[in-house]
Amino acid sequence: MSQRHSPKEFLQLELVHVARDSAVFQYTEGSGATIACFNFTAPEGILLHQKLRERGLTSSVFSVNNVFPHDWSCIKQSVARTGRLVVLDDSKSINLLGYALLHEVAEACPASQRIIVTREAEIDFGVSPDTFHIDYDALVYRLVSEPSKEPTVV
């Protein structure tokens, strides 16, 4: 991908784990939350990781590529350990890959707290807006307070 396509600097992070098919990259290891980043949300996932760490909650951050079939076993193992999953997906499609991960995690770890952050839909039908906004304070509060058992869409 050309730098001109992205207004952000590219992150150069050390890897903790790479899936055999290069579908999943893990950048951090933690026991308090699992963060799965789809599309171009790895920088936001790392920022959320840092904000959680400031509140005493460590997290595992994964970047997920769109590879079929999906092997998210390392993410599901992390959720089984942490009990919390945050999916960040800034894709413009209405068929977000993040929803498929939420479904698999719900089956594998039904007691886990599951939150997905997507683009805001300002219109009933059509193309999603270019903005992707995360209310980090509200998200961190949700994660460090008593976990909800119901999936949440933000």
Region roles according to the model:
Residues 2-154:
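Thiamine diphosphate
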